[in-house]
Amino acid sequence: MRNSYVGCCVFAVVMMLMVGVPAVSGAQVAVGITVGFAPPDLPVYEQPICPEEGYIWTPGYWAYDPDFGDYYWVPGTWVLAPEVGFLWTPGYWGWGGSGFVFYEGYWGPRVGFYGGVNYGYGYFGHGYEGGRWDGGHFFYNRSVNNVNVTVIHNVYNTTVINERNTRVSYNGGHGGINERPRPEEEIAARERHTPPVPDQRQHVQAAR
């Protein structure tokens, strides 16, 4: 049996002071769980079709269930942005010196740091190549998104060259991604944010 532990009351500030902790944007904090073993590689999966205009793709990720002592997969899903102009910064797992800590995702006017993890479908480690807001409407990049143009007309097609072939799902630690926040991601960390919306919370619970 794999050795694991769940440590409660883990604060992001404390973890950042420990040796080997990856850089964390100021907007993301640990959710209170430390896990003694790394999450699995990201699986390969197909993106479902976008339901309608205004929905933003939130990629799948590994969550941890302390009751079962193991990770479980939360599928990616389309989520209606809580505000016009808001984009999703995915959460990510990062090495915290004595275990892996999860830094929760958030909504904001620009995409912040998500550990350099290549989640795919526009989230290739930094930023978001899947679409943009323009004039109060969200425009989808068809080269990386599954969009029905008979339903959604705000589309464009820009080829994105993804040179990251790794499916590693965590930052830092043994075998982890060695990436730190870029200047624009540090700026994003200081902007106004909104936590995951109720639909996202329910989606996580349904995946357990």
Could you tell me what each predicted segment is?
Residues 16, 46-48, 77, 117:
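Residues embedded in well-ordered secondary-structure elements
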